[in-house]
């Protein structure tokens, strides 16, 4: 009886361990999938995470199309990504295109691209920008630009390939959002809104395409050492900087490798580091569950993590208040 009782207690833990081990094995197999002759399209591919994704895809044998507005940067990026190719038959193509233009123009460019490079196997929506500042200090022009590029640009580019992917019965659609799509941050009100919108779009799109063999992944990278981040730093409020520093600064190659691996493994959510794991667990809600082991972790950790998140929020509010007091003191002294 004691032995039977012990087995009954241990069985759930053994089952969980088996699920986790199998999930890790499956992840390793799928994330190392060969991309030889597969066509991968990357928007925002001339710099930052987008360019690093180009390197990762090229290392795995893919034919890569880098899309961006600046032709000079595209030429330089093409040269760099070419150096990562592992096969002489690989092709690295560039397309100068503003994905915030009218959809008809984008659609035509993608039709021409398919004739040149073949059907799309994966599209990685990396184009985006952030203008930091309090809402009252953010111009309406900057608000429009952020929503057009961060949200509408990704929607338009995806719309240009989704019908083809569904008809061919396979494909991967990747959206590079931000940890700011999980939590609103001081000085990033509009940016957060645009990334939250992208997350909602991706969840709905996943329902539309999953039965057609098309997978959707949303990546939530932390602060990453890119030219875009360097530009943000120029106008970033002190409050935003202090809050952001709690997650550290990641290298674009590290972030890109994780995004591509998670996408190939069929994960809906891709994060980096402990902060990313905490946020994705807390914000899982009705998001698609594509990994049983991760689902079990969410069930057990969501409660404790909520306490941790409350402590984070108190700390953030303390930082904001501290900055406000310092500013008021400075005003009085002037």
Predicted feature descriptions by range:
Residues 126-131:
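Conserved NAD(P)H cofactor-binding loop of Rossmann-fold oxidoreductase domains
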Residues 207-292:
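SDR active-site lid
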Residues 39, 46-47:
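Conserved glycine-rich cofactor-binding loop
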Residues 178:
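Residue(s) in the substrate-gating loop at a strand-loop-helix junction
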Residues 60-77:
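Conserved glycine-rich Rossmann-like NAD(P)H-binding loop of the short-chain dehydrogenase/reductase
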Residues 134-135, 142-144:
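Substrate-binding pocket helix/loop in short-chain dehydrogenase/reductase
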Residues 158, 194:
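Active-site helix of classical SDR
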